[in-house]
Amino acid sequence: MSGTGFRYGLNVMKKKKPNESSNRITFTEDDSSSSEQEHAPIPNSFSSQITAASDASKDDNYDASIYGFDEFYDSMKSAEREQMELKRLESKDRRPKYMENLIESAKKRKRDLLLARERALLKKNELEGDDATEKFVTSSYKKHREEVQKAIEDRKEEDEKSITDTTTGMKDFYASMLDRQEKIHQAAVEGVQNSKKTGAEIGDAMKGQDTLGSDNLILEAKKKGLKLELNDNNEIVDQRQILTAGLNIRKSSANNSMRDDKKRNHKSSYKRSLSPSTRYHQDRPDKRHGTYSLEEIDKQRKEFENRQRLQKEKEFQKSREAALKIHASRNTTETQVQSARERYLQRKKKAATNP
């Protein structure tokens, strides 16, 4: 156990002795160099060089303003003080919100009251005569009357203008709405007419250039700004002309027309081969999905009732005949029994008389 180096209890590690070479004072040939070179740290490894370089880069990227709390606080408060100063100036020049309107309306009422009094006074003077108008009239009063007369004329002009400017309610609303719809409709009609014109011009150009291929025509039209394409029948059409007013029915090709002619001829020849009655019934219009008149409805109702009545009569006749047959068969057996009984009695009587 002593040879292994372990002991019972705590295994206390021995402290390493300090390097004596580092503490020794040596004198070399570089003692005459400057003090900065003597105290400069000498990197011992590559990792220490990297850490030194990273510390230098951090020092270069260091922003001294990140700790400027006082400057930031002062700038923030200065902005707040400026805002408060602006509000104070605005509040100094601020007036009551509705006071100006109230003052203006009060002046207007006062002017209207003055005009009403002047009108009443003029009417009174007219009733009294011309002499009464010249009594106790001064130059200032004449000037005042001129101002009042001018105010009355201005008021009349304002009333007339307000009457002409004011709308008549729903009438003007509907009139403006109809005018707007009419303008939209007119613009749509003009657009359709323009598209038809362009389509006709394209058709004329296509007829005049039959020798060129469809691809060349489409390329030329695209250069001109038109939008063309080939439809299912290999016809060149304008995209604006595809959906025009009315039903958008495509033109049937020549093959379809020939096929329809063949079907029509075959149908006509088949009808000619039929009898007149069959042809009449086939040519009658099919009214299963159509409309009927009252006379036709009444006629059909009567025919249905007659068919029902005849069917009931036939059923009653059949049931009656079956009952008669059963009854007749029963009567026949009774007569046969009666005749047999009579013959039996006769034979018995004969036997009694001839022992």
Swiss-Prot record:
Entry GO terms, CC: nucleus; ribonucleoprotein complex
Biased amino acid composition, Basic residues: 346-355
Source superkingdom: Eukaryota
Keyword Coiled coil: yes
Chain intervals with Polar residues compositional bias: 44-54, 329-339
Renumbered residue ranges of the record's region Disordered: 1-57, 253-292, 325-355
Keyword Isomerase belongs to the record: no
GO BP of this protein: regulation of alternative mRNA splicing, via spliceosome
Coiled coil (residue ranges): 99-162, 293-326
Family stated for the protein in its record: Belongs to the NSRP1 family.
Name the UniProt record assigns to this protein: Nuclear speckle splicing regulatory protein 1 homolog
